[in-house]
């Protein structure tokens, strides 16, 4: 499993214990507002907004918060956010992609650079590591509600490339340009997915020792804790022992 997915699994469990929902809701709301401003405020006519709302629902964000974020897009006091992708190397030479929505490019760049430097890594130029990743569409369904074999058959028929299953979820993977069509076909058969959107997926992962793994997890956690950072993806793989330790 790639470091990014492992990190998400670990933080999902920790998040419930630490009750750090307000920061997460703030990031989800920002994406909803930006998506609504860039297109129509109707999720049925705006794929990015629909994806943002699905992500918010998956984290149990209150409906009022979601509606408020959509309405904010039409307000005169709506801040202007820039979408920026940072790329760099973390401890052990691991490739890291950071996606941000910021109202101050200089501030965010300075903060992200300092995180990389303090971790023993370095921030590089855009394009420095993204060639090591594939940009894909991903649609996630609850494993308890959707049969894996039925989903695989329907997904391939709809034009998807593969389905990755775990105990909790089934993830349908497809080409970026096929996402809307595949999602529509699967929703008609299985109902609304937990999540749907574009992801970065490492072509290969690097197995790191536990010391390096802990340093990388601290870097990713620090990046995720920044208000402007929306997503962090990396190409490392942790040992099962370290995963268990970090999840405890």
Swiss-Prot record:
It is found in: Cytoplasm. Keywords: Cytoplasm, DNA-binding, Transcription, Transcription regulation. Its main location: cytoplasm. GO terms for molecular function: DNA binding. GO terms for cellular component: cytosol. The keyword Transcription regulation applies. GO terms for biological process: regulation of DNA-templated transcription. Pfam families: TACO1_YebC_N (PF20772), Transcrip_reg (PF01709). NCBIfam families: PRK00110.1 (NF001030), PRK12378.1 (NF009044), YebC/PmpR family DNA-binding transcriptional regulator (TIGR01033). HAMAP family: Transcrip_reg_TACO1. Belongs to the TACO1 family. This is Probable transcriptional regulatory protein AZC_0510. It comes from Azorhizobium caulinodans (strain ATCC 43989 / DSM 5975 / JCM 20966 / LMG 6465 / NBRC 14845 / NCIMB 13405 / ORS 571).
